[in-house]
């Protein structure tokens, strides 16, 4: 990874994620060597690993694997949104979309918008938060969007 480790997200609990809240995640550079190594290992399609084949593809050059883009989003999410004190994981993701190619050298920034936040009916120590996460490139184009479901611990009694 070409970026220094960022500080962990501040301690927040379910109650700190009201519907409509927006969180900026910061940004990360798409390192060309990481694009190549990730694709060689996990997604070896020609437009990710072969410059000549990629030049002839609809993308006109090497692009990052969508899964690599999602992993960059996850780093920003873990460091800027999910509090280690309250994150209890996720039962899944809805509507994962790769909306535009991500190229080596791009700088991606992330934003989280809370769509809903509801206390769990069966487990009173937690809540369920559904968000919209969007990743944009340096031109402002949305390149990735998804709607994860997060389980977050409720604030402990004082």
Question: What kind of region is each of these model predictions?
Answer:
Residues 2-18, 98-158:
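HotDog/MaoC-like acyl-thioester-processing domains
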Residues 95:
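Short aromatic/hydrophobic contact patches that present stacked aromatics
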């Amino acid at each position: 990874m070409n970026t220094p480790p960022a500080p962990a997200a501040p301690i927040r609990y379910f109650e700190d994620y009201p519907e409509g809240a927006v969180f900026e995640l910061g940004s990360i550079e798409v390192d060309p060597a990481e694009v190549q190594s990730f694709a060689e290992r996990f997604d070896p399609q020609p437009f990710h690993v072969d410059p000549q084949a990629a030049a002839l593809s609809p993308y006109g050059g090497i692009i990052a694997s969508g899964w690599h883009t999602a992993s960059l989003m996850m780093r920003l999410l873990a460091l800027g949104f999910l509090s280690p004190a309250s994150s209890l994981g996720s039962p899944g993701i809805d509507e994962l979309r790769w909306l535009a190619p991500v190229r080596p050298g791009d700088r991606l920034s992330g934003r989280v918008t809370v769509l809903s936040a509801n206390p769990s009916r069966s487990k009173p120590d937690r809540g369920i938060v559904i968000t919209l996460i969007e990743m944009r490139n340096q031109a402002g184009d949305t390149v990735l969007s998804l709607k994860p479901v997060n389980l977050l611990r409720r604030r402990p009694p004082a």
